[in-house]
């Protein structure tokens, strides 16, 4: 099934808006969350086809939310791409170990982002 609904998780309203606008202009339905806690709740309610997850957020960070979403029975099938400024190899490895399927470093290149999103079609 092609990716149609994407959840954008980022505590920055600007980042959420930029990603949401890019994805909508490219034919995707977008839902957004501003925290790890909200992402977990919304993942169960919305059942998106893909999640773009920031790492650095107050409260529950993106690694913790990814681990929870990727282990919950109702949501473990949803692929997660980490989108973060944390660019060290150890950060990428840790993200993948928490259940992320891919990892993009900010600032995001829109062409690369759309290619990665499209690879889940």
Description of each model-found segment:
Residues 101:
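Short, glycine/charged-rich "phosphate-handling" switch motifs in NTP-dependent
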Residues 27-34, 42:
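Short hydrophobic/Thr-rich beta-strand motif most characteristic of the beta2 strand and flanking loop
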Residues 57:
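Receiver (REC) domain active-site loop signature in two-component systems and cognate sites
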Residues 17-25:
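Charged docking surfaces used in two-component/phosphorelay signaling
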Residues 108-117:
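C-terminal output helix
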Residues 46-52:
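Active-site beta3 strand of CheY-like receiver
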């Amino acid at each position: 099934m092609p990716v149609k609904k994407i959840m954008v998780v980022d505590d920055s309203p600007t980042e959420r808006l930029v990603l949401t606008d890019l994805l909508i202009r490219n034919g995707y339905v977008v839902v957004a969350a501003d925290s790890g806690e909200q992402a977990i709740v919304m993942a169960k309610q919305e059942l998106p086809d893909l999640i773009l997850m920031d790492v650095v957020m107050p409260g529950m960070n993106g690694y913790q939310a990814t681990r929870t979403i990727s282990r919950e029975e109702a949501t473990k099938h949803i692929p997660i791409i980490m989108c973060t400024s944390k660019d060290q190899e150890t950060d990428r490895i840790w993200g993948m170990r928490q259940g992320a399927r891919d990892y993009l470093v900010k600032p995001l290149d829109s062409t690369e982002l759309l290619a990665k999103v499209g690879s889940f079609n």
